[in-house]
């Protein structure tokens, strides 16, 4: 688990979207919406987790430089894949949609 300081730093790195409150709404690396208060909520289409860009199984560490916010289904789909991986959720306007598994 990550402490609040790390969670906040990772959130701050997520993509801001014009005309949306960046304190509440951002997008992950796959283009899926995430909501700040939905951290760790796998029962939400807007839930997110902290992803290790360079997977721990390949020697990636917990330094913030190697961490990013990722919609939870995209994080599951990515798993230990690096550098290429597949997304399962992307945005369509202001909502998230299931896309199968698209190459990112």
Regions found by a protein language model. Name each.
Residues 2-48, 71:
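Short cysteine-rich loop/turn motifs with clustered Cys
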Residues 63-94:
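Short Cys/His-centered divalent metal-binding micro-motifs
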Residues 45-58, 62-74:
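Histidine-centered catalytic micro-motifs used for acid/base chemistry in nuclease
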Residues 17-19, 57, 78-82:
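Substrate-binding/catalytic groove segments of enzymes
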Residues 102-104:
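Conserved small/polar residues in nucleotide/adenosyl-binding loops
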